[in-house]
């Protein structure tokens, strides 16, 4: 007799979701649905509000990556008001965003992913959690994970007032600067973060890559999906988290598209299905081809593995060295092994730490010129960043008083 299996809620993920499996008369899977069953409504209830309120509202979309929404909103205001942040303000923003990348990637790896890789997929489900991870790696490492996240959240809090859910985003700049006294503890935090990033990658090699079972799992054909990939890159096609062009490569790794974030709606299509509240994004020129991978797909993937697949190189030397090792292990580029996303995540955290070491030494960081007030409303603004789990777009339109008349969000 046909029946249905429901897994609700799904745990250890960012947000809420459930899985429904429909079985045929023989008990085999006939269909499967991954559902986001909650209506968020941010695109609607923000209408009628002043645009400058968005950096205070949208961090509440997510408790894991509020800084990504905050920064996308702030950059959308830059575009809306036709203003570029000052060089010092941009440095401070990148410092904060790298700090967020570091603490966010480690909450994902150690709290959400490591229970499967470190504790093990065959362990008792009651042990597959952060306490089980600490039981395996030791209290000292557990305390380091907490410390690296706390210290980087202190940077976020110092610049934008709160962590999580920062709220100080301003068009053309930042709400406060960095003093020379601040620079000292920021340098210490950056150095500690770099040391921890190298340790985390070595831990992954020691625990995961030295275990044939895990390596076979990562390389297993069942966990490969051939799709297009999307991410931000700089002018040299290196991975950029804060800014740059949106680049798309095809399943073979060749460049398919490259465009300004402001033109995203010419290249990205949004599809809806009756069984989920989430929008299903695809490459507009290819049309909606359904949830299929391989030949004929119009789907693109984002997040850390996509970031490394899209970029010709990382921006920092240690991260680039680790990316080469990863692709050599996976059999070349692009890599379609979904489980390798966790490895790529640690490499992205390493780049963020390397960049903050450099930013902390930059003489311009302590400049008092932190706001460009040459604002000119142009009624439309789009902001884009690489959220930890992928390319994020915020699109705002206003009337001549700066009151929102349209909000569209493409959330990774």
Language-model features: where?
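Active-site bordering "gate/hinge" segments
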Residues: 1-391, 401, 411-412
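Extended hydrophobic-aromatic, low-complexity segments
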Residues: 392-396, 404-408
